Swiss-Prot record:
SUPFAM superfamilies: P-loop containing nucleoside triphosphate hydrolases (SSF52540)
Function (record text): Phosphorylation of dTMP to form dTDP in both de novo and salvage pathways of dTTP synthesis.
Transmembrane residue ranges: none
Database matches in Gene3D superfamilies: P-loop containing nucleotide triphosphate hydrolases
Organism: Brucella canis (strain ATCC 23365 / NCTC 10854 / RM-666)
Residues reported in the UniProt entry to bind ATP: G10, G11, E12, G13, A14, G15, K16, S17
Catalytic activity: dTMP + ATP = dTDP + ADP
Domain of life of the native organism: Bacteria
Alphabetized NCBIfam families for the sequence: DTMP_kinase (TIGR00041)
Name of the molecule in the record: Thymidylate kinase
GO BP term, example: dUDP biosynthetic process
Gene for this chain: tmk
Pfam families: Thymidylate_kin
Amino acid sequence: MSGLFITFEGGEGAGKSTQIALLASHLRNHGFDPVITREPGGSPGAEAIRHVILSGNAETYGPAMEALLFAAARADHVDQLIRPALAEGRIVLCDRFIDSGRAYQGVTGNLDATYMAAIERIAIDGAMPDLTLVLDICAERGLSRAGKRRGSDTADRFEKEDIAVHEARRQAFLEIARQEPARCKVIDADRSQEKIADEIRSVVDTILTEKGLL
């Protein structure tokens, strides 16, 4: 894979989609044609699974089986979209990837780390992100932002969960970043969109320069 694979992680209301859009605009200004995608979803098969997961219908199967659904969606996403785009030399910007699986299913789903690692390995089949940007914000602030963004729309099943669960996921993301500093960069997301975007652009531009692409 010769492109650049960048994932955005963080809790609800961290501003991932906004920052992805801003980074994509920056990249286009430099002549790149980035691919923007998300998880769960990103390919027709994965989007069908996304609907089942976010509707809450998969909860009855239990955390272990739900994790398999996420893995199935991820495998289809990687095979149908991410890997082909990287093979073309494209920059892929993905809203959530393996670290959300680790934090959502592995930590707050209380699933065994060995089990999670096994299905992750099968799902991505070597398609590891080059850079993961962890947008960090306290759970209370993030949920407040998510509520304002959502407006009158119904909250999805994850937004409805207890604040302690959201904070546990936040800490899980931070722990992943501590364990994998070469891949992960923690971004303070409790700032203005402009300041966050400036830092992200700086991080990405450095990588592109190192690769001789900028």
